[in-house]
Curated annotation (Swiss-Prot):
Source organism per UniProt: Brachyramphus brevirostris (Kittlitz's murrelet)
Family note: Belongs to the complex I subunit 6 family.
Cystine connections: none
An annotated GO cellular component: mitochondrial membrane
Biological function: Core subunit of the mitochondrial membrane respiratory chain NADH dehydrogenase (Complex I) that is believed to belong to the minimal assembly required for catalysis. Complex I functions in the transfer of electrons from NADH to the respiratory chain. The immediate electron acceptor for the enzyme is believed to be ubiquinone.
Protein name: NADH-ubiquinone oxidoreductase chain 6
Gene Ontology molecular-function annotations: NADH dehydrogenase (ubiquinone) activity
Membrane-topology descriptor: Multi-pass membrane protein
Length: 173
């Protein structure tokens, strides 16, 4: 199980690296899917099944819509590939930043802050993950309505921007 969690962490970091150094929006979608699946699997291995499911639905349901619009607006006739020297340079630069972060993180880890889990303690306790469901729908109902209206307004704004003056989709020239 430890190796699987380490593998998910490595996939999450590589997915974030792929999103940050993508040569075109087509490859950014692949990196986002890899990072979201690995991150949600990581949460699932920690026992946060509801949070993992909600984040998976948000990332793959909402963020991929943003990438679809960005791909349609920035469609290149000759997109760059992963093997181009500029993309490899970006990847190496981000990898160096990650290595420096791991070195600094090893220094900070020596301070020993402890490990935080999502399970409650006791025989008749409700898991903190599932008690969050009740808080989402009781205290956060107004915020859900405001966020829903904001997303609907954003959808209409993006549709108007894509439509343009010619009453059709924007095409690459």
């Amino acid at each position: 199980m430890t190796y699987f969690v380490l593998f998910l962490g490595l996939c999450f970091v590589l997915g974030g690296l792929a999103v940050a150094s993508n040569p075109s929006p087509y490859y950014g979608v692949v990196g986002l899917v890899l990072a979201s699946v690995a991150g949600c699997g990581w949460f699932l291995s920690l026992g946060a099944s509801f949070v993992s499911l909600v984040l998976f639905m948000v990332y793959l349901g909402g963020m991929l819509v943003v990438f679809v619009y960005s791909v349609s607006l920035a469609a290149d006739p000759f997109p760059e590939a992963w093997g181009d020297w500029q993309v490899i340079g970006y990847g190496m630069g981000f990898a160096m930043v990650l290595v420096v972060g791991v070195v600094i993180g090893g220094f900070v880890e020596s301070w020993n802050f402890g490990v935080v889990t999502v399970d409650s303690v006791g025989m008749f306790s409700v898991r903190l993950d599932f008690s969050g469901v009740a808080m989402f729908y009781s205290w956060g109902a107004g915020m859900f309505l405001v966020a829903g209206w904001g997303l609907l307004l954003t959808l209409f704004v993006v549709l108007e921007l894509v439509r343009g003056l010619s009453r059709g989709a924007i095409r690459a020239v």
